């Protein structure tokens, strides 16, 4: 197979995760250019992938103004900056890997899917959960008829109290206007899993949820704007930024603060940047818990719960069928099949393949990249998370958010 060349647009945390595939499999993928507004990120990528300075750009516009210089574009910008570079890259002839969500606009999602079809290019959306051994095992059991006809599904997404504070209170995805609603940004993964496991079109959605806790009303008396401003609650507050970001851990989430991982560099970032703010005094507006109920074309029903208020960060799934049930916990990487005609359940303990150790989402990041590279190598063969497939889950998310706000059932 030929080596695929790629440009990286957006060199933040997600962009660097996907680009890592080129480090570990240089015979398959090579990063040849980068675009990012932050100079330190550009320098890091150039150093890591031996990219000349002339191939580093301050913006995607400057990069894509050049003639096509690679086979593919990895587009990992923030949510509200997905559509324009994706359409421009497709127009230039690039195959595209696009971080989810496709867009924070329903019409733009449809436009992206249509553009990919017209351009006859691979456009893979980063619905990484489809690629995990965990969910692939569940899908295989369902397709093999082990539990008969699927009747219902329920999934819980435990975001984790500190993860929610990091990403959705202080971080890039805290504000639905600047980013996306929580159901779209975080939980389009889960809607995609429902669609994939059901194999049917969703026809009806209802949803409830709100921002309950991370707001000014819950700020302790006398708490300052920043954790670094002498907060009297530092010792007792689980969200104290100094405890979270000034420990010995310099990986995620600490590496989101700055590229300077010295204690002084991190403290400076907390004093000046968004991650040092009090969690009760931010400009966040996304929900901190939400439930969604769905009905599919074949009558299958599904329920989903997302909550910030957990100690663990994992998904749990239950699939009930006419001949048995599947219960699964991503935290323990265990899938349990209990057929009604068998006295004892079958316990499937999944191992994490060693090649996925440097990736997230239960190995999904690694297998997504492998699938994308192979699709490009094969000149555009269909992949597991194409834009046309991913569009369905995005439409469910937009409907769920309308239902939550308008307090009514939405027909799709």
Model-derived regions, located:
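Rossmann-fold dehydrogenase core element
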Residues: 111-128, 148-152
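C-terminal helical cap and adjacent loop that interface with cofactors, partners, or active-site loops
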Residues: 49, 286-412
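N-terminal Rossmann-like dinucleotide-binding module
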Residues: 1-51
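Beta-loop-alpha module in the N-terminal Rossmann-like domain of NAD(P)-dependent dehydrogenases
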Residues: 12, 51-115
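Hydrophobic residues in well-ordered beta-strands that form the structural core
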Residues: 98, 104, 123-125, 328
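Predominantly a Rossmann-like dinucleotide-binding segment in NAD(P)-dependent oxidoreductases
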Residues: 129-277, 407
